[in-house]
């Protein structure tokens, strides 16, 4: 009983020290990234991208669109709260030497510091692919991933629309990585910003890559917007986040994925407002 009381005292003190920093960090990243991507794709460049729309969100009734976005923002705020609480533990663990964070840029050298960015990216992609597949198991889906899949036609606000269980699973890549390998403080900050922008773009609802990239042997390793959009449409396959190679290696990429990208990137606007596929 005394240990339980000690824990609650420690946690209350940690919350007092960290809550505003954690909340500001998590909320700022979500709202800045999602609103920037939404304004850029759905408002500023909507005219130029209209033939690249992947779903039917634009043709739905305004009240239905508003309900979807409200739901996505609500669950995203819930995820921000989960991330805030878990960040408190992360900060406290880092302060007590549990995790291998460091702030001296010379401690492990420049090569390691920059190389760790790529290493973390690859680690996150692998973690995302396998945890994502696991959450599609019937035993886990209802409690973790079902909320995210209520959206069949994503918007940038879908990025953090998770059940608390999925939010917790997604958060764990940073503490797991930092338990094993050193991670510079600023590398972590830059990565978290990159991750949320990449997440919002993956749910943008418009294909953004140039025509031909998806079929390129190197550029095609990048997971396009279509790649993740098809996952939302079909609720299976295309589990990767940054890259396509795990899906290709494990045979989980949709067979018509490249054709869908071609369809989105080759369409040209017709004078009458219709569209056609060229090539």
For each predicted feature, which ranges?
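Cytosolic/stromal cytosol-facing helical appendages immediately following the last transmembrane segment
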Residues: 1-31, 48, 56-65, 140-279
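Membrane-helix interface linkers and caps
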Residues: 10-14, 38-71, 94-105
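Alpha-helical transmembrane segments
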Residues: 22-37, 111-124, 187-191
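Transmembrane alpha-helical segments that form the membrane-embedded catalytic/substrate-channel core
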Residues: 36-46, 119-136, 191-208
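Core segments of transmembrane alpha-helices
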Residues: 78-87, 91, 95, 162-178
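Juxtamembrane helix-loop-helix connectors linking adjacent transmembrane helices
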Residues: 85-123
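Juxtamembrane/interfacial segments flanking transmembrane helices
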Residues: 96-101, 127-144, 205-213
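Function-critical hydrophobic alpha-helical transmembrane segments in multi-pass membrane proteins
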Residues: 110-149, 158-162, 171
